[in-house]
Amino acid sequence: MLRSFLNHLFGSRGVPVEDDGLRLARDLHDESRHEEAIKVLNALIEFKSGWAKALVLRGATYRALGRMEEAFADLSRALALAPNDAQCLYENAVAWYKTGDNRRALEFCASARLADPGFATPRWLQAQIAFGGEAYMAVLERIHAFLKPRTYIEIGIFQGESLQLARPPTQAIGVDPEPKLLKPAAANHRVYAQTSDAFFAAHDLNVEFGGVPVDLAFIDGMHHFEFALRDFANVERHCTRGSTVLIHDCYPLDRETARRDGAPPFWSGDIWRLIVLLRKHRPDLAVHTIGTAPTGLGLVRNLDPDSRFLTQNHDRLVEEFLALDYSWLDENKPGKLNLVANDWKTVRQLLMQS
C-alpha cells in the first residue's frame, strides 16, 4: 500500500520514490507547511524503517511545531542510527537550544563540527548562543527605522537583503564588485558593480547624493581589515559628526573564523583589527561593538569629515595592525573591542549620543 501511495505521489521518475518523498517533505518543511510534511514523512518512515534522514527531518518538523517530546524521540532514534551524521547532530543541538539547554546545544554543535569540519551551520547557532538577542539584520533594520537616514551607502551588498532595508525617502547606494541581487533594485537604490576602491576613485559621494552628507553607512565588504580601513576613511569624509557608520564582522567567534584566508559562509576575517585601530589612533571617535550574531556589528559615531589621519598613515597603520596576532584578544576580548549588550535600549542610547 505504501509503495502504491508513494508511486502515486511521485510517479516513475527513474529515482527511488523515497528520495523524491524526502525532497518533497523538506520543501514542505521549508515552506512552514509542517503538518503536510509530517504526513509525507510518516509514510516514508513506515515504508523504509530506520531511515535516519527522514527521522531527522521529522524531528526538526516536530520541533518547529513545538512538539518537543516527539522531536526528541525522533532525533534520539536518528542519533542511534547515525551517530556521526553532522545534520543529525546539528538538529539535536537546535532542539536543546529551543528548550533553553545551551550547554547541551553547544556540545552537539561541537560534535557536528567534528563530524564535518566543512559544515558551517552549527557556527551560526554557536554565535547566537554566545551573543543572544536579535541577529544583526534585525538590529540594522531597527537602526534604519530609528535614524530615518536621508542618505545611505552600503559597501558589500551581495544579494541586496540589507540594502532593501533602506526604504524611501532614503537615497541609497550599494557597492559590490559582483552583486547578486535577489530582487531588482528599488527606485531609491543605485547599485555600482565595482570594488569600493574603484567606486571612491571614480565617484564623489557629495555629488552622488546631491550635496547631502552620508547619514548612515554600512561597511560589509572584503573581510580583510585594510579594505575596511579604506572604506571607513572614504566614507567618513562625506559624513557629519552626527552620522553613523556601521561595520560588520568585527567580533570574531574564534581564531578560525578570524583567519584572513577563510571563506564563506561563516567567516569574519580580521575586521576586528579596524576596531582596535580606531580606538587606539582615533580617540575622538565613539567606537562600540554591538554583540549581535553572527559576528558583531561595529557602531561608530562622532565622525570627523576633515580628518585625513587614516589615509595619510594608511601603510604604517596596516603594517602595525597586521602584526597584531589574534591571541592578543584572548585576554578581555569584550573590553578590547568595546562590546556592548545586544539590546535595543542600549543601541538607541548610543545612536542618540552627540
Regions found by a protein language model. Give the residues of each.
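A short alpha-helical cap/connector motif
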Residues: 2-17, 21-39, 43-47, 57-64, ...
